[in-house]
Amino acid sequence: MPELPEVEVVRRGLQSHAVGAAIEAVEVLHPRAIRRHILGSEDLIGQLTGQTIASAERRGKYLWLVLEPAGVGLVVHLGMSGQMLVQPPTVDWEKHLRIRLALDSGADLRFVDQRTFGGWSISPLVEVDGTMLPESVAHIARDPMDAAFDLESVVKVLRGKHTEIKRAILDQTVVSGIGNIYADESLWRAKIHGNRIAESLTRPKLRELLTAAHSVMGEALDQGGTSFDALYVNVNGESGYFDRSLSAYGQENLPCPRCGAPIKREKFMNRSSFSCPRCQPTPRARRIA
């Protein structure tokens, strides 16, 4: 699933190429693409047609378009393979095109999703801490790239967590935007093993970790995000290249860029964790009461 940098790349593209355009027509080409919109395709088409895309917004890994004058959010779930592409209408339809918007700018806004895990839904906007969010996103915490991110408050929350630190920073209600890739990269930079218990870490160490998350995601954003295959692209269909700069994630048996020890892979939930056994020693006590 795309993480914060990849979603932000898409958001910026939509802000540049779709915002300000009115929606003239809507085609829903696959029912799974709107399964989260429980009122169905006719309702979604009716709510979208005639609306203007006022802005493209993001919180963590969640993306939405603000529509006016209705004042609602079109929530875009990218899933594992979702793409938002701005195309001239003369370009042939993509094989896995699921939804197409015809804009008054003369362009198409196309939702392409090979694996059909993603989709669109319309949600009312609600105010949370001075920010308007789709109701379905209201429970999501601010992310480290958010100008209003309160580092000390998050440190305090993490200090109260009796769980592995990696699991804690993947909790989108604590801090959003961090997924498996950037969790491993941030933990590597802060020299923390993901199995360390959050409450056992000092406040300075937690600040270091969250600062590392901000830095690594900022660097990834500058490089267009991380693309392991052709499915993670921006609105112009271009892939990012931060995967070439990864220090830990996916680097099993390669030398740690800091100390030279081979990076190791461990099972974590239904995924994998990558870390340096020398820079990030495994904690002695891993059990949680």
Swiss-Prot record:
Binds 1 zinc ion per subunit. DNA binds at residues 96, 115, 161. Pfam families: Fapy_DNA_glyco (PF01149), H2TH (PF06831), zf-FPG_IleRS (PF06827). Its cofactor is Zn(2+). One of its GO terms (biological process) is base-excision repair. The keyword Ribosomal protein does not apply. PROSITE patterns: FPG_CAT, ZF_FPG_2. A zinc finger (FPG-type) spans 247-281. Its EC number is 3.2.2.23, 4.2.99.18. The keyword Acetylation does not apply. The active site is at 2 (schiff-base intermediate with dna), 3 (proton donor), 61 (proton donor), 271 (proton donor). The gene is mutM. Involved in base excision repair of DNA damaged by oxidation or by mutagenic agents. Acts as a DNA glycosylase that recognizes and removes damaged bases. Has a preference for oxidized purines, such as 7,8-dihydro-8-oxoguanine (8-oxoG). Has AP (apurinic/apyrimidinic) lyase activity and introduces nicks in the DNA strand. Cleaves the DNA backbone by beta-delta elimination to generate a single-strand break at the site of the removed base with both 3'- and 5'-phosphates. One of its GO terms (molecular function) is zinc ion binding. Keywords: DNA damage, DNA repair, DNA-binding, Glycosidase, Hydrolase, Lyase, Metal-binding, Multifunctional enzyme, Zinc, Zinc-finger. This is Formamidopyrimidine-DNA glycosylase. Belongs to the FPG family. InterPro entries: DNA_glyclase/AP_lyase_DNA-bd (IPR015886), Formamido-pyr_DNA_Glyclase (IPR020629), FPG_cat (IPR012319), MutM-like_N-ter (IPR035937), Ribosomal_uS13-like_H2TH (IPR010979), Znf_DNA_glyclase/AP_lyase (IPR000214), Znf_FPG/IleRS (IPR010663). It comes from the Bacteria. Monomer. It catalyses: Hydrolysis of DNA containing ring-opened 7-methylguanine residues, releasing 2,6-diamino-4-hydroxy-5-(N-methyl)formamidopyrimidine; 2'-deoxyribonucleotide-(2'-deoxyribose 5'-phosphate)-2'-deoxyribonucleotide-DNA = a 3'-end 2'-deoxyribonucleotide-(2,3-dehydro-2,3-deoxyribose 5'-phosphate)-DNA + a 5'-end 5'-phospho-2'-deoxyribonucleoside-DNA + H(+).
